[in-house]
Amino acid sequence: MKYIPVYQPSLTGKEKEYVNECLDSTWISSKGNYIQKFENKFAEQNHVQYATTVSNGTVALHLALLALGISEGDEVIVPTLTYIASVNAIKYTGATPIFVDSDNETWQMSVSDIEQKITNKTKAIMCVHLYGHPCDMEQIVELAKSRNLFVIEDCAEAFGSKYKGKYVGTFGDISTFSFFGNKTITTGEGGMVVTNDKTLYDRCLHFKGQGLAVHRQYWHDVIGYNYRMTNICAAIGLAQLEQADDFISRKREIADIYKKNINSLVQVHKESKDVFHTYWMVSILTRTAEEREELRNHLADKLIETRPVFYPVHTMPMYSEKYQKHPIAEDLGWRGINLPSFPSLSNEQVIYICESINEFYSDK
């Protein structure tokens, strides 16, 4: 068996055709037809009114926070079990991230812990739909409304996921997506900010375009940023969007093969009730942290790449000064593994991965 990476993009649609159109037209920077086409199609498919492209998923989060007016002295509640970009974006604004633990069943942010962490400085709750499984948005939105808080959805890992029949990204005041090369759809590097609020949308456009005023050419009235996506990236994104349903369907098939064939000593991250899980990364739990490293080494010997589940951000040096224990997130972070999950994986490859895992557990 050849080397199996943990992820690789599937560029099997009209990516080359659309990129060549950009090259032929010479519209290769942040202006061009594909920007608008991608934004419009993305908004339509995700059932939101407004969508604006950005250069990556991290700046999408920063832009969303800026649009909400989050700044120094504010607190933003965020799960500790997440990729660090979610937390860093809060720090970029001068606000303070307040960490919450995870739910043991779903791995998503704990609603009960959110409630305990709200203070008079809290301005927003940032929900991160970890590995493609939605958070409990009904309870989170209800809690946020009762406390007059903004809700930001970080959908970087959950494009196409649904909670009670509604797409993630449609529950919050503002939501973000990432299109890095290992995401469900990719632009190479890129992101999107979506909202149903025209004021927030306009603020995003203003900040992402160097703070350019609308009433006078080359007049800037705020300190803005260059967070724009290129036309070439948008062209790739549009081609990816046209294949998105097939990508997600295949990823769910892959997850089913894993669930049906992996040794019962391993716990597979599953789909909860009322949730449509897109399985960005099919993830498993070993019994101990030591066993995880042994299994990862075993799989590496079999030419199978894996990743550790994210380490809780509150344990990292720049965020651990006021350490508080978050036991569930810490447990998941030490025992979890991400398995190869990209759409072009063959059934034969997935079965080989399952057999390699089962071989490891054959004498356990």
Swiss-Prot record:
Catalyzes what?
GDP-alpha-D-perosamine + 2-oxoglutarate = GDP-4-dehydro-alpha-D-rhamnose + L-glutamate
According to the UniProt entry, which residues carry N6-(pyridoxal phosphate)lysine? Answer: 183
EC number(s) given by UniProt: 2.6.1.102
The effect of disrupting this gene, in the record's words, is:
Mutant is deficient in expression of the O157 LPS antigen. Increases adherence to cultured epithelial cells.
Q: Which InterPro entries match?
A: DegT/StrS_aminotransferase, PyrdxlP-dep_Trfase, PyrdxlP-dep_Trfase_major, PyrdxlP-dep_Trfase_small
Q: Does the keyword Glycoprotein apply?
A: no
- Give the matching CDD domains: AHBA_syn
Please verify whether the record's keywords include Kinase: no
Q: What class of enzyme is it?
A: transferase
Among the GO biological process terms of this entry, one is: O antigen biosynthetic process
Q: What keywords sit in the KW lines? A: Aminotransferase, Lipopolysaccharide biosynthesis, Pyridoxal phosphate, Transferase
Pathway the protein contributes to: Bacterial outer membrane biogenesis; LPS O-antigen biosynthesis
Q: Name one Pfam family in it.
A: DegT_DnrJ_EryC1
* GO MF, one example: pyridoxal phosphate binding
Cofactors = pyridoxal 5'-phosphate
What modulates its activity?
Answer: Divalent ions have no significant effect on activity.
What is the relationship between pH and activity here? Answer: Optimum pH is 7.5.
**Protein family per UniProt:** Belongs to the DegT/DnrJ/EryC1 family.
Q: What does this protein do?
A: Catalyzes the synthesis of GDP-perosamine from GDP-4-keto-6-deoxy-D-mannose and L-glutamate. Can use only L-glutamate as amino donor.
User: Quaternary form?
Assistant: Homodecamer.
Record-given protein name: GDP-perosamine synthase
Provenance organism: Escherichia coli O157:H7
Q: What is the lineage of its organism?
A: Bacteria, Pseudomonadati, Pseudomonadota, Gammaproteobacteria, Enterobacterales
Q: Which gene encodes it?
A: perA
